[in-house]
Amino acid sequence: MAKTNRIKIKLISSSGSKHFYTTTKNKKNQINKLSLKKYDPIIKKHVIYQEKKI
């Protein structure tokens, strides 16, 4: 079987609300850490989520 190029990552809220999303990313194409603006349902606002490994 072929080795997968995708790794699981956790996107953690920068607001400190302990909310997170999980997703995968291609480790060969995306070398830098991922940072996305997503909705945080705990504080009911859009905030920046930053990548951490699972």
UniProtKB/Swiss-Prot annotation:
One of its GO terms (cellular component) is cytosolic large ribosomal subunit. InterPro entries: Ribosomal_bL33 (IPR001705), Ribosomal_bL33_sf (IPR038584), Ribosomal_zn-bd (IPR011332). PANTHER family: 54S RIBOSOMAL PROTEIN L39, MITOCHONDRIAL, LARGE RIBOSOMAL SUBUNIT PROTEIN BL33M. GO terms for molecular function: structural constituent of ribosome. It comes from the Bacteria. GO terms for biological process: translation. Keywords: Ribonucleoprotein, Ribosomal protein. The lineage of its organism: Bacteria, Pseudomonadati, Pseudomonadota, Gammaproteobacteria, Enterobacterales. Belongs to the bacterial ribosomal protein bL33 family. This is Large ribosomal subunit protein bL33. Disulfide bonds: none annotated. The keyword RNA-binding does not apply. The keyword NAD does not apply.
